[in-house]
Design a protein with these regions (language model features):
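N-terminal leader/linker segments that initiate helical-solenoid repeat arrays
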Residues: 37-92, 99-100, 108
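Structural marker of alpha-solenoid helical repeat scaffolds
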Residues: 82, 115-117, 147-150, 182-183, ...
Length: 299
């Protein structure tokens, strides 16, 4: 499918697989409970048997999904140094670095996985995602091009859409965003990104429709609510949309609408919206107060 899409359009994201954590946690709980009991030789033997049930794979899985990310990085870095031939440990290190937000480190770790000659298409996709987060566009494009076209996943198409956006290849971007949205059960995030792409191009109506679609999938996605207000404000509609919101969110969205109005020269409307935001917030809302003061109006 990808190859066909590229031909039609012209030339030119991460979670670990679910693991059996419940059994691991049960074994840990059993060991802890036994150690708390009055101990004798028999109890120690049972405790050792319980702990021996924790294989290296169990520990790695626990680190990947339940452990503190920094602790997981230390674990996999130490393990990979001890057993450099094991690509699974380098993969665990790369994924753990992603969890800490160290995208530079993650990209380097994924480089090592790819250099091992045993990287999967999913590994290469993770590497491309790390490069996209670092805005290393040319390297990200090369990384995606190295993935077989038969590897058609949500994350692959999401990254293709982002790179098409960067290149301002709007038709390709739209095609990739649409495909990505169809490959996930939780499309709100990619619909929101697609909407922001439309907004940046000046297609305010198209952006508004996509933000509304994102909210129909995930009604509490605040980023989509805020972007929807921006899209409406771009065509001078400053009324808040009929979406579910808390009082705090209402204040924040009124503040966004106010700034959109002021940016377009509708200063009086913007000032009124700032006062509404200040009144809506259950506590003192400093961003609105500061904006009012900047306009030379009393708070």
């Amino acid at each position: 499918m990808l190859a066909r899409r590229r031909g039609a359009a012209g030339a030119d994201g991460q979670e670990a697989k679910p693991m059996r954590i419940a059994s691991t946690m049960a074994a840990l709980g059993c060991a802890i409970a036994l150690s708390a009991c009055a101990g004798g030789p028999g109890h120690q033997g049972v405790e050792r048997a319980s702990l021996s049930a924790l294989t290296d794979g169990d520990i790695d899985a626990l680190m990947m999904t339940s452990g503190d990310p920094e602790t997981a990085v230390a674990h996999f870095a130490r393990s990979a140094e001890a057993e450099p031939a094991r690509v699974d440990l380098r993969r665990g290190l790369a994924l753990s670095l992603e969890r800490t937000g160290d995208h530079e480190g993650a990209a380097g770790a994924w480089d090592e996985v790819v250099a091992s000659g045993r990287a999967t298409a999913e590994d290469r996709t993770h590497r491309a995602a790390a490069l996209v987060r670092l805005s290393r566009w040319a390297e990200a494009r090369a990384a995606l091009d190295a993935i077989p076209p038969t590897h058609e996943t949500y994350e692959r198409y999401r990254l293709e859409a982002i790179l098409a956006d960067v290149d301002e290849q709007w038709d390709r971007a739209d095609s990739f965003y649409e495909t990505a949205a169809g490959l996930t059960d939780t499309p709100a995030g990619v619909l929101n990104n697609w909407g922001y792409s439309k907004l940046s191009r000046g297609d305010h109506a198209g952006a508004e429709r996509l933000f509304a679609r994102a909210l129909s999938e995930e009604p509490d996605l605040f980023t989509a609510k805020n972007n929807l207000v921006l899209a409406r404000g771009a065509r001078r509609d400053y009324a808040l949309p009929a979406v579910r919101m808390t009082q705090v969110e209402r204040a924040q969205l009124l503040h966004t609408a106010a700034l959109a109005a002021i940016k377009q020269g509708d200063v009086a409307i913007g000032r009124g919206l700032l006062y509404d935001a200040l009144a809506s917030h259950p506590q003192h809302f400093e961003p609105a107060a500061s904006a009012i003061a900047a306009l030379g109006a009393p708070v």
